[in-house]
Amino acid sequence: MFLKQNKFKLIIFYLLLFFDNTALSYDEKNFYYNFIDKINTFSSKFIQHTYDENGTIIKKSSGNLIYKKKLKYLLEYSKPNKVKFISDGKFITTIDEDLEQVIIQNQKKFYGNIFNIFTNKTLIEKNFNLTKSIINNEHYLKFTPIDKDIYYNIFLIVISNDKIKKITFMNDFDQSVTMIFSDFMTNEIILDSLFKIDIPDEFDVIVDNKKE
């Protein structure tokens, strides 16, 4: 879920083969910025594939994602393990049902969060170069960090028919992760109460207030 923030490393994703590495024109950048500006909320089912450095799938996961500006989201994995990541905009709470454990952390600790990046126009303009390719009327956007020694790894977004179809990024373990979305819905009414946590009494709770 989170992008790696230390020394710049990455696996060359197979999707990069399709890119012409042409910097986006003003209109093309506006295409993406207009796209994210129009989205106040979205929800989707997803299937997630995690690959090792040889490109072999080592884990398949599935679940649901609900997002609301700014930085409120519920990322719920249902298979193979039941884990929830809940952000109320200030804190990220991880609920692991198998471990019966809850971890509460400051949102600022995860500034490299994939959702924080691709929905934040100011952050993108300041820290990333965008390149694009259009294949079968689908927009493939590659985000390359300007400061490769400090900031985030490359990540890719595929947009089709005004919907996010796929995201590919690196996780904290140098593994390539691809999230494939389905039933993608935008601008539905989502109440803030959805992002409040309900912790079972028998769960262990760990609070980490560190910002870094």
Question: PLM features: residue spans?
Answer:
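Classical Sec-dependent N-terminal signal peptides that target proteins to the secretory pathway
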Residues: Q5-S25
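N-terminal leader/targeting segments and the immediate start of mature chains
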Residues: T22-I58, L71, I199-E212
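Extended beta-sheet lipid-handling architectures
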Residues: S44-Q48, K60-S62, L75, S87, ...
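A generic structural motif
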Residues: I47-Y51, E76-S78, I95-E97, T144-I146, ...
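Beta-strand elements of well-folded, non-transmembrane domains
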Residues: T50-D52, Y67-L71, D147, N161
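An acidic-aromatic
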Residues: N64-N113, D174-V177
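Gly/Pro-enriched, hydrophobic low-complexity segments
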Residues: F91, L123-N209
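Flexible, surface-exposed loop/linker segments and immediately adjacent secondary-structure boundaries
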Residues: L99-E138
